[in-house]
Each structure stands twice: as structure tokens, then as C-alpha cells.
Amino acid sequence: MPEESSPRRTPQSIPYQDLPHLVNADGQYLFCRYWKPTGTPKALIFVSHGAGEHSGRYEELARMLMGLDLLVFAHDHVGHGQSEGERMVVSDFHVFVRDVLQHVDSMQKDYPGLPVFLLGHSMGGAIAILTAAERPGHFAGMVLISPLVLANPESATTFKVLAAKVLNLVLPNLSLGPIDSSVLSRNKTEVDIYNSDPLICRAGLKVCFGIQLLNAVSRVERALPKLTVPFLLLQGSADRLCDSKGAYLLMELAKSQDKTLKIYEGAYHVLHKELPEVTNSVFHEINMWVSQRTATAGTASPP
């Protein structure tokens, strides 16, 4: 494909022609990352990041999975990281799901016959759930870390939700304030890394994006009774961003025959960047779960 005379650039002014990327159905350029094992991959796994962050924050997890001979791939969602789009704005939450399916389809053309897994954190967990629900039987398994299933009861009271819907009609770009980084993790070093990361969106959650997150919660709740994909669900009991009750709801409603929940008492939201004893356990649980299912997945995922 010939490049434009004036090349498209990332929000950080890097030409996309110099970076791995895809162009979505709306013509937006999305920055991609790939972690490829040295040998022949056993499976593919797409990593779906959370709101306001980017795919680069999954480097350690991706390298661990790559060590299991998985080909790990990801992109920065629209409006995030090094992808195009107004920061933390999306016309409809389904755009995120559509883009994931586009990326998955592209990778399956290059690696036909390999099983495909999903891994999602927070908002990325909701994206993973909706992606799996849209294609029953397509995915070999799913790992969910503190997924968005229920809105935080403190921030989604009936009054606040009603107020947000009214504001969305008149002031959709009004900021509701930035994410409080202190509730992400008890690991102060990780919080400092988050605070100094130039690719993190610090503009604050806009009303219009908050509405899309509420829409996502509604769609996830409707999708759960139809969900049959095997999954591993990891959740912190002290998560103040994604209500831990959502984990129990997911376990109760999902029709999956193979489903596992592990609760980390006292842990916050970003379990893969928590206190060492939590994060080490998270990596171990994911390693064991994925290893067992790649050994038995075969060619479960159609092209």
C-alpha cells in the first residue's frame, strides 16, 4: 500500500509508516505491538488494555506469554496511546470490539489454524467479553484481570448516572476528572511509573466516554448468559474502579463450563502491577491456566 505524501502521524508526531499499525473501518490508524516467540507459535493471544492506558503497559505479561510459545499481539484502542482519535473518546463502545475482531482476523490469515485467546484488563476486560460473545465458539479461552462488569457503586449512583445522561446531551466533553492513580495499586513504585508515563491520558474522563462505559456495562450484562468461552478471572477484593461484585456476577451468569475465579484479598485494581506477592501469583495463575489450555486447544478456533 503506497504511503501518503504527507504521512499520518501518531499523537506523538511519529509517522505511522515507521511503526506497526492497522487502519480500522473508520480510517483511523491504530498503533500495534507484536511479541513473537523464536519458534513456531502454539497459539495467538490478543491483549486488550484498559481506559486511559496503552498496550505498552503489558510488556512483562506479553513476554511471559511469549515464553510459552504464544504469539502475543495488541493495539492501542482508538483515542489511546499512540493511536489516532480524540483522547478517550469513542463514538460507540462497539468500535473497540470491531477493531479487535479486525486485528484477530488479520492475524488468523497469517497464522491459520492456531487457537486464539483473549486477555483483557478493566475496560479491556469488557471489550474481551463482548468480543468473545460476538463470536461464540471462536476463541479458545479468555483471561480477565479486574474486568469492567459492574460500575463502581460510588461513582455510578442513580443520581450520578442520570446527571451524566443529561450532561451528555449538553456538555459531552465536560471532564469528570482524572483517574485517581492511588487506587490502581498498593505498589507505590508502579503508581509512580503510571504517573510518569507520557502515553497515559491525563485529560480526565469525559462525560461522553463515561456514558460509553455505562453502555458497555449494560451490554456485558446482556452478553453474560450467552458466554461459553473458557475463562480465568482474577479480581482484587479492594478494587475501587471495577466493583468486585462483578466478578461473582460473571461467574454466576456465564454459561462457560470451564471457568475459574481467584480473589486477591486486599488487592487493588491493577493486579499485574500490584505488590510482588500478588503480581507473582497473577503471573503464575495465568501461566498455568494458559499452558494447560494451549496443550489441549489444538485447532479449536476456526479461521
Curated annotation (Swiss-Prot):
GO annotation terms (biological process): acylglycerol catabolic process; arachidonate metabolic process; fatty acid biosynthetic process; inflammatory response; lipid metabolic process; monoacylglycerol catabolic process; regulation of endocannabinoid signaling pathway; regulation of inflammatory response
Top-rank taxon, per record: Eukaryota
3'-nitrotyrosine sites (modified residues): Y58
Membrane topology value: Peripheral membrane protein
Catalytic reaction equation(s): Hydrolyzes glycerol monoesters of long-chain fatty acids; a 1-acylglycerol + H2O = glycerol + a fatty acid + H(+); a 2-acylglycerol + H2O = glycerol + a fatty acid + H(+); 1-octanoylglycerol + H2O = octanoate + glycerol + H(+)
Keyword Lipid metabolism found: yes
Gene Ontology, cellular component aspect: cytosol; endoplasmic reticulum membrane; membrane; plasma membrane
Keyword Cytoplasm: yes
Pathway(s) served: Glycerolipid metabolism; triacylglycerol degradation
Keywords for the protein's UniProt record, in alphabetical order: Cytoplasm, Fatty acid biosynthesis, Fatty acid metabolism, Hydrolase, Lipid biosynthesis, Lipid degradation, Lipid metabolism, Membrane, Nitration, Phosphoprotein, Serine esterase
Tissues where the protein occurs: Detected in adipose tissue, lung, liver, kidney, brain and heart.
Residue numbers carrying Phosphothreonine: T10
Record-linked PROSITE patterns: LIPASE_SER
Residues in coiled coil: none
Matching InterPro entries: AB_hydrolase_1 (IPR000073), AB_hydrolase_fold (IPR029058), Hydrolase_4 (IPR022742), MAG_DAG_Lipase (IPR051044)
Name of the top EC class for this enzyme: hydrolase
Major location category of this protein: cytoplasm
Location of the protein in the cell: Cytoplasm, Cytosol; Membrane
Catalytic residues in the record: S122 (nucleophile), D239 (charge relay system), H269 (charge relay system)
Function: Converts monoacylglycerides to free fatty acids and glycerol. Hydrolyzes the endocannabinoid 2-arachidonoylglycerol, and thereby contributes to the regulation of endocannabinoid signaling, nociperception and perception of pain. Regulates the levels of fatty acids that serve as signaling molecules and promote cancer cell migration, invasion and tumor growth.
Additional notes on this entry: Short-term inhibition causes analgesia, while long-term inhibition causes tolerance to endocannabinoids acting on brain cannabinoid receptor CNR1, and a reduction in brain cannabinoid receptor CNR1 activity.
Subunit structure, interactors included: Homodimer.
Name used for this protein in its record: Monoglyceride lipase
Organism: Homo sapiens (Human)
